[in-house]
Amino acid sequence: LYVKEIEQGIEGTGIKAGIIKVASDRGGVTQPQEVVLRAAAQAHLATGIPISTHTWSPDKVGDRQVSILEEEGVDLNRVYIGHSNDDTDMDYLLGLLRKGVWLGLDRYPGGRVPGTPKWEERTDLVKGLIDAGYVDRIMLSHDYSVPKARHGAEVQEERRRANPDGFNFIKRSVLPRLKELGVTDQ
């Protein structure tokens, strides 16, 4: 399925997939998720298309994902471990980076899930990774859940209150804080 959608297009549309997305969450990589990760690895090997993962960093799920992809021979320079800033464990993140993957620091503004870091802590983490020499291996983004009609008015309003800047949050809050912390435009 992966290779077909990459080479021929998705469901007869002619629109070709440009990335393979896989997901594991709280509790680690389940057996069915491992099967999917291995299939994604085989599709990557056949096509060269990069792999993006959904993960839960407080459980260090990225370690197992990377281990499976490594076993399959995936070029880890073509792997993005998403949601890596849901925890501030630098040793865990540096371990992933040393293997050659990209980190998605993509849950800004954060802090909505109990026990996860607020945006300021996430930004301090970015500074630490930059200071450790990995500015070229991290990607900042929002993973912003746009208030959707399927949610009731109360949920939509709560999301707006949590992030009134929407897709401008990084520009308006994170980048200025990084500058305050001494990060330059270089």
Task: Name what the model sees in each region.
Residues 165-186:
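Mid-to-C-terminal alpha-helical segments outside catalytic/metal-binding sites
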Residues 2-12, 94, 122-136:
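Short amphipathic alpha-helices and their capping/turn segments at secondary-structure boundaries
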Residues 31-35, 58-73, 89-97:
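Distinct, well-ordered alpha-helical segments
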Residues 105-107, 134-160:
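Short acidic/histidine-rich active-site segments
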Residues 47-50, 70-77, 95-104, 134-136:
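Glycine-enriched alpha-helix->loop->beta-strand junction motifs that scaffold or abut catalytic
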Residues 50-57, 78-86:
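Catalytic beta/alpha-barrel core
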Residues 1-50, 102, 107-112:
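Active-site gating/metal-coordination segments in enzymes
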Residues 81-87, 107-131:
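Active-site glycine- and acidic-residue-rich loops that bind
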